[in-house]
Curated annotation (Swiss-Prot):
Gene Ontology MF terms in the entry: ADP binding
Name the UniProt record assigns to this protein: Uncharacterized WD repeat-containing protein alr2800
InterPro entries: Cro/C1-type_HTH, G-protein_beta_WD-40_rep, NB-ARC, P-loop_NTPase, WD40/YVTN_repeat-like_dom_sf, WD40_repeat_CS, WD40_repeat_dom_sf, WD40_rpt
UniProt KW keywords: Repeat, WD repeat
Source organism phylogeny: Bacteria, Bacillati, Cyanobacteriota, Cyanophyceae, Nostocales
Amino acid sequence: MILQSTSLFCKYINNCRYINREIVATLKASPQGLARIKQARSDRGWSVDDFRWLELASEILGVCWQENGVLAAGISEGTWKRFLAGKQAINAEAFKAYCQVLGLNWEEVQEGGRTKERKDTGTSRQEKFLSSSHPHTDWGEAPDVSIFYGRSEELDTVKRWVTQENCRLITLLGMGGIGKTTLSVKLAQEIINSEKIYLSQSPEYIIWRSLRNAPPVEDILAELIQFLSGQQETNLSNHLQGRISLLLKNLRSSRCLIILDNAESILQAGDRNGRYRAGCEGYGQFLQCIAETSHQSCLILTSREKPQGLAKYEGDSLPVRSLPLTGLQEQEGRELFNVKGKFAASCDQWQVLISRYGGNPLALKIVASSIRDFFDGDVSQFLEVSQQGTFIFDDIRDLLDQQFQRLTTLEREIMYWLAINREPVTLAELQADFVANIPPRELLESLSSLQRRSLIEKSAGGFTQQPVVMEYVSNHLIEQVCEEMREWGLVRSRGAEEQRSRGEKIHTQYKLNAALPLTALSTPLFTTHALIKAQAKDYVRESQISLILQPLINQLITEFGSLENISNCLVHILSRLRGKSPQETGYAGGNVLNLLHHAQVDLSGYDFSGLTVWQAYLQGVNLHDVDFANSDLSCCVFTETLGNILSAAFSPEGQLLATCDTDCHVRVWEVKSGKLLLICRGHSNWVRFVVFSPDGEILASCGADENVKLWSVRDGVCIKTLTGHEHEVFSVAFHPDGETLASASGDKTIKLWDIQDGTCLQTLTGHTDWVRCVAFSPDGNTLASSAADHTIKLWDVSQGKCLRTLKSHTGWVRSVAFSADGQTLASGSGDRTIKIWNYHTGECLKTYIGHTNSVYSIAYSPDSKILVSGSGDRTIKLWDCQTHICIKTLHGHTNEVCSVAFSPDGQTLACVSLDQSVRLWNCRTGQCLKAWYGNTDWALPVAFSPDRQILASGSNDKTVKLWDWQTGKYISSLEGHTDFIYGIAFSPDSQTLASASTDSSVRLWNISTGQCFQILLEHTDWVYAVVFHPQGKIIATGSADCTVKLWNISTGQCLKTLSEHSDKILGMAWSPDGQLLASASADQSVRLWDCCTGRCVGILRGHSNRVYSAIFSPNGEIIATCSTDQTVKIWDWQQGKCLKTLTGHTNWVFDIAFSPDGKILASASHDQTVRIWDVNTGKCHHICIGHTHLVSSVAFSPDGEVVASGSQDQTVRIWNVKTGECLQILRAKRLYEGMNITGVTGLTKATIFTLQALGALR
């Protein structure tokens, strides 16, 4: 918020009126001044019709501003536009106010004006402040300080420390409201603008960040590293010290100025020793390294207390220093008062007033409002009253106490909500927070009152509070809720004896208060305010938890003695809520549920039936047997059943987001609330791509079932299914007129379809490999297609002719996108690059390098200025299309990023990943706004121990589960992997289990202890398969990095790397004698390796798609393979001849297994079946039906009597080989197992379907 300080202007106006009668009443900008006005407006990103100038100008002129758009007296939209046009002179007062709004000196921009050196007012370079004009600045949420008073001595001191004396760490200390933040921003601005600082002394990078919401130190370090490395560091260490070391590397190589504001937020409240808040201890390690390690950069902290451990590094001649800030001087304080209006006081009275409040700028602003509103600007009257002791001031909190006591009930409620929201909120958002319906007029009046008192601020984003005010109100909220809970049945602790007997006293108090009606406690904040908002932006909700909810729990523990007592109290509150109306109970039910969860109470079996439960955040929370029958669950957030998500698209108006995944579903979400609105079911295999029609009425999807489907966005009904492709369909795109749809397929063709009747209009041929993506040009005349043949083809849509083939990539071209202005085409490739093309000429204009893995998806922003890319390296990069540099790298996904999409307004980015999450990002700040997470316990690989005792299953929940398969009893889980587990194998002696994961590691586990004793880390991509050598001393692993590795399990040493496959290795098997190893690959081949020499001694080719598994028969004479071409093949591997092809599956075949005698073969398929085959005849004996999702694996028991199968329906099934009957179903408890949602309200049908899939009952 702009520091409101305009006394020079006010003095000038008064002097003009009463002294200098000859002053000109109108002013006009000179041509040079007009250019500066336009530049200043452009730097702020304001359009001519932007109304943010209105509020600021109103404040400066001292007239009332209104939210509803009514212009204040003397200020009109026409005057503002005439000022910007510069053709006519306008009212002098308005001219000066408008200049001040833009941070300009009116004397220098007026016609016939003068230019002079200025000290603290706007400078020629100040206009560009908070813009992107400096090539290496990132201001984050830094406030505008274009209006600034005094502090010249402090500025000079700190500037000297930074630029001349090479200080590494500087702490600006002072009480809340003293001006630390403003000084830090002004300092950075002056360093940029100063012509007296030599280039060698000036920082090359300046970054400003606020710690107000206590972000994890790892997140702050990631932001700093990305910025200082020019977005080149993508592989950040998961360890704190690794990130610190990487940051120090950048601080040594370049001169950097880092400013971290509000550092008191990471310190324990009320602790003058500067100890760190729980969870923020890593900041101490970070600051220690900055202080004691040699580098050429400077970190500036602003804080109310000095962080612990820094004092020992400080000294007048040492590179670590601190500067305590005191209040403003008298003259500076008087100028601040002038912003608020007219005040009458003698020099002595001014001195007394400013001295009494220590020159604290925030305190003076608040007091000025009181004097203006209650004493008509008469300082002497105020001083007379204050001498009676009603305005005692030792700390800013004292002043806020006095102000808070004088607020109306509605004003207090607004203050609480602004503290909870943590960032600016609009009037509509604030109104929606209230349980009661507050008329907009009353809300506006209260907001206006609070704004006049300087208790709240208004920015372009809405209403908020200064950090010191927000902290005060948050603490007040916590104290008030604690008091309310005591009134509801708890007693205050009074010494050790009472602490010991608290349980009995609590019980007694329950009896005493049991008869009290809920309304007897007035209107508790516990019911009127949500302690956290489940649907808030992710980073806001995390700060609500760490700064409101968790401190409240800590205080309750102090009050009540134990978590059990807290739990008892909350249960008692629930009983008092039941039977009351939503208006009476408000947010209490949701608050109880959130408190119980974050107090780590096991919620199993809790009764929330018949209650209003709003704003409960329940993603990832076990709710086994919880009763929500007949409850109102509005605004609650639950876990989703998302698979690996492959694509995302915004609707044309930006209100909806569609996603599709490997669960064969298309989902439609409401962006603002995060609600799941629709689940479109109909595809029979992975859904690869989704896109909205230009009018937003139709959703098109395509997938591995070779179909394209059209859905009604209104109700999720499938309108048409377009058939004709003979392979997976990877991409679809609507023509701009919405009448034609293009589809790209693995059958190497593109088809154009008529949307109305579903007929295929044209089939475009020319690519020699899978066509991965299609996109129409903005004018609809050209279609671009990209393929696995490394090329891009441009087609004339009307004639179906190939106009041009673009060749430059060296890998699959996975994505293409036209810029909105139609000037360029971008392409993303498996060669890890992005290329920008002039598609009219075929010239490659630029190649973007930075990703360390395949680029899967790209998208232009609506204004064509930014290109976004998503990659297999798990990052999202934003590229400036004018400078062609990476301006931001977004981290957070833990697996490959498959799809990226800009919202229509260009402000939000949607990204989806194989980590089963959808994330929305703020494009400007890089903050994650919202994330939807899937929770599915897929059973991926299964394996019997050779001793028949245990069945193991690997899951996408990152664990290996051990089962007593004969009884169906779950034994335990092996935890340690950080991603999906795709391969498991037992050692021949059953003592060791190996697991392979998409976290690129292989782990070896001791089955008896459940401990991991070896981690193998040399693969550079997902590890799909692991197998033990028959002698048990060596394992082989296969990876998406296209290599097979052989390992010594005792030492963890990699013995050999076999690397002749051209695509990922999906399956492996040893020959019974251990001499050969077979590897199955997505390159459609099986290779046979001599394990002693590492040479490839044979290749089996015959499948027409990815080969998922290859296994030797027990006698070693034949090999069986399976593929996504829906077949199983039997081979004479010595001759390289296919003996049989087993057909019958109607979808991909993922896994096969021989019975111990080699006579039977089992196969697992995406068609949800297991088939039992006679190896000799090739006939199918049994089709085992029961799974409700794809079957990913099969394994025979050592005695060959049963087969186990693992499925994405989250079950393992045991089948009788002779009969095909299902004998046993093994399933771990799902997240919401047994949760009763009978009669619930506030949830969409899609969400209810999801809850049922996770175990809920209805």
